Design a protein with these regions (language model features):
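Hydrophobic residues positioned within well-ordered beta-strands of beta-sheet architectures
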Residues: 4-6, 53-55, 66-68, 92, ...
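Hydrophobic-ligand binding "helix-grip"
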Residues: 58-103, 148
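Hydrophobic pocket/interface hotspot
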Residues: 17-21, 27, 53, 70, ...
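Beta-strand/loop substructures that line and gate deep hydrophobic ligand-binding cavities in soluble
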Residues: 82-133
Length: 149
């Protein structure tokens, strides 16, 4: 099963980063505009264990719907799993590490599986490239919003 990992450091204390990332609205802020991501409904405005969200967006010019659930939650770490959506499987773990000196490391680990049988191998490469672009954008926006002035 393919894995995608990404990490970066933001110049901000961990509690401020945690507060930003556990407000579900952050997702619309850090996602590239071309994906047209919209949060349709969530069972809670803050990310907590058991929270479910329904999201809409675009992937490869096609509107998709995504239903996810927070399946693991503790201070400075949570995991969301796709219940229904464009992937056969999607498990995304978010971790935040205090580096001291007003620096926080943000770590994303994603295990995913694409549908499409025989096309899967070809699409895996494309998916990794797209994930790299999306998470580079997330890094840039997060740093813009949170880096201490």
């Amino acid at each position: 099963m393919p894995r995608f990992e990404n990490s970066f450091v933001v110049d901000q204390q961990i509690d401020s980063v945690w507060k930003f990332y556990t407000d579900i609205k952050h997702l619309e802020i850090i996602t590239p505009k071309k994906l047209e991501l919209k949060i349709i409904k969530c069972t809670n405005p803050e990310i907590i264990l058991g929270q479910e969200c329904w999201i809409e967006g675009k992937i490869i010019m096609k509107k998709i719907k995504w239903h996810s659930k927070i399946t693991f939650f503790r201070k400075h770490e949570y995991t969301d799993e796709m219940i229904e959506g464009p992937f056969k499987k999607w498990i995304h773990t978010h971790r935040f590490s205090d580096l001291g000196n007003m620096k926080t490391k943000i770590i994303d680990e994603i295990e995913y599986e694409l549908p499409f049988g025989l096309l899967r191998k070809m699409l895996n490469k494309y998916s990794k490239i797209q994930l790299e672009k999306i998470f580079n954008h997330r890094k840039n926006i997060t740093c813009l919003k949170l880096n201490k002035k």
